[in-house]
Amino acid sequence: MSTKSYDYLIKLLLIGDSGVGKSCLLLRFSEDSFTPSFITTIGIDFKIRTIELDGKRIKLQIWDTAGQERFRTITTAYYRGAMGILLLYDVTDKKSFDNVRTWFSNVEQHASENVYKILIGNKCDCEDQRQVSFEQGQALADELGVKFLEASAKTNVNVDEAFFTLAREIKKQKIDAENEFSNQANNVDLGNDRTVKRCC
């Protein structure tokens, strides 16, 4: 019997307008590389990275969705099962920021009720081209009730932090809560003295 190389699997989703840097952010996080050339994601792509949190190995399965309107119907199916969602906009593109509410509305409509969300203002290294201030980003995050970070895939600012913040919240609320429930169930079921061995 093969043993799993991780303790928990968490599915994350990257959403936002086309060109905001979703693929670049994912590439930086999963492979620590950056490409300046813009390649449009067709439909869906995903990458995997296993991280360690509180002594547990967490396998992150991160789905990169196409931002173009014609792919919206394809991507809605991928909201299901997602435990965390990164909503991205480009700080140099006000329109992508204005569209965050539409993306958020899609999440509310299609994702599970208690999915965790974080708002990311990408390309914060392009200070001279900035159209959206940090304060505007924070104000929108406060309005939507989500955490907020500015990041740069190019200069590797807050990239790990974005994914780790989301993973930490999910682990704390969902996985630890499940373990608590499981422990309570085990305490009640005193008649069952079987020893269950878990693979790690």
Curated annotation (Swiss-Prot):
Keywords: Cell membrane, GTP-binding, Lipoprotein, Membrane, Nucleotide-binding, Prenylation, Protein transport, Transport. The keyword Nucleotide-binding applies. GO terms for cellular component: cytosol; endosome; meiotic spindle pole body; nucleus; plasma membrane; prospore membrane. GO terms for biological process: exocytosis; Golgi to plasma membrane transport; intracellular protein transport; vesicle fusion. Protein transport. Probably involved in vesicular traffic. Belongs to the small GTPase superfamily. Rab family. This is GTP-binding protein ypt2.
